[in-house]
Amino acid sequence: MWLCALVWASLAVCPIWGHPSSPPVVDTTKGKVLGKYVSLEGFTQPVAVFLGVPFAKPPLGSLRFAPPEPAEPWSFVKNTTTYPPMCSQDGVVGKLLADMLSTGKESIPLEFSEDCLYLNIYSPADLTKNSRLPVMVWIHGGGLIIGGASPYSGLALSAHENVVVVTIQYRLGIWGLFSTGDEHSRGNWAHLDQLAALRWVQDNIANFGGNPDSVTIFGESAGGVSVSALVLSPLAKNLFHRAISESGVVLTTNLDKKNTQAVAQMIATLSGCNNTSSAAMVQCLRQKTEAELLELTVKLDNTSMSTVIDGVVLPKTPEEILTEKSFNTVPYIVGFNKQEFGWIIPTMMGNLLSEGRMNEKMASSFLKRFSPNLNISESVIPAIIEKYLRGTDDPAKKKELLLDMFSDVFFGIPAVLMSRSLRDAGAPTYMYEFQYRPSFVSDQRPQTVQGDHGDEIFSVFGTPFLKEGASEEETNLSKLVMKFWANFARNGNPNGEGLPHWPKYDQKEGYLQIGATTQQAQKLKGEEVAFWTELLAKNPPQTEHTEHT
């Protein structure tokens, strides 16, 4: 290993394959899996890593647009030491996201396949003992249309905090979301895959040193939305015990406004499956090749497909479930970043607002174009411009303020409303706002953007311990965030000795500002929530409401 030590002397991580003397082999309910040991500098106990462990049958043929089924058993020792293919998606955009948010040093080979229901496991446990460590299950983001498990290395988080980290995959885009609005294709296949992965964890994680009675689900963006959908789903009862939503909750997506049949009809027309019945349409789409569906995906407006109120995963709208308090009231961390629309989202959307300047007329026409996504009627646009843009005459500042408005509508306000509902139902709730610019982000990003969408991921996964270039300040911030997240996974409370106090989100609405300075504050987005609540109460948007039959 001297060569490894010499070549990578400047790095914080040096993988040592086959250490201890033989690689780890673990029994699952379906068969044995072979992993590999990876050591992190400063830790005597290596992390056992298992990549591409199947948790369901490949969702092919008749299982396309159908609930996942348990994997078939195998009689040999399955080699799980290479990254699995990511679920089918637009490869160009998928690579862009993976490059931007990859938390580890290792280059992840980007392969895509419809056969993708796999998970990765990082366990610091001595597998010869009954360790029962807390388990943290990561649900990746990417708008439910792109992304995968492997860009998120659980190596540093598992080693530093002595937790078992599991990163899961789920069907994306048309494969994960296609719904006819009836029993022929109810939709929410992505969430059913997530539930199948959590059931697999319940049945198997003890043999990897994890405690099935201490499972925390955490995710970012669409992963955060998924976490909150699972909290609201009766199907997820007892599958997890704590939850963390980073930059996304299910209230973000206006699910009760989605016209499922119209979207299905558009897909049918574009695909040439324009049949008279739902059953025939589904049958026709099942005959399409993966490449044909991928071509269809690229043609589709990505915002047209989403989680639906299917009567199964979600029996009612999120708002109704929260009002009735009929959900899994587990301890919950909810948070978002200071500038969610700072750079990465506008870039992924094709350089949204590429002009460096903005005036009221431009803002008004822009808001009209996006009014369906914002769930607003056009009549309220003047009030929004008055609230957000009138405080300055600087056209560059006006653009920043308009992006702040998008951050509020899509992230800040839904997070606060969700947290209030969780609190009122008796779930121990903690809120944060992340305010830091990681050193690992693209050089193309403006220096002024602090706390962009996805920035907290580098701290959560301990990237300063896996990649070179982090300052002492950034390294310490990552230690702090990992400690908060892991304490919460252990105890349902992020607080611990030597940490800044994180207040519970109660009627005082205390929260934590996390960044170069980490401190308590109160009433996160309180003024903005009051503005939007009053505005929408007086001017409800005229949109269609469809549910499954």
Swiss-Prot record:
Top-level taxonomic group: Eukaryota
Residues annotated as catalytic: S221 (acyl-ester intermediate), E340 (charge relay system), H453 (charge relay system)
Matches recorded under Gene3D superfamilies: alpha/beta hydrolase
PTM annotation (Phosphoserine): residues: S471
Signal peptide: 1-18
pH dependence (UniProt free text): Optimum pH is 7.0. Active from pH 4.0-8.0.
Pfam family, one: COesterase
Intrachain S-S bonds: C87-C116, C273-C284
Keyword Glycoprotein in annotation: yes
Function of the molecule: Involved in the detoxification of xenobiotics and in the activation of ester and amide prodrugs. Involved in the extracellular metabolism of lung surfactant.
Catalyzed reactions per annotation: a carboxylic ester + H2O = an alcohol + a carboxylate + H(+)
EC number: 3.1.1.1
Gene Ontology CC terms, in alphabetical order: endoplasmic reticulum; endoplasmic reticulum lumen; lipid droplet
Listed GO biological process terms: lipid catabolic process
Protein name: Carboxylesterase 1C
Residues spanned by motif Prevents secretion from ER: 546-549
Subcellular location: Endoplasmic reticulum lumen
GO molecular function: carboxylesterase activity; carboxylic ester hydrolase activity; protein homodimerization activity
Glycosylation sites: N79, N274, N275, N302, N375, N476
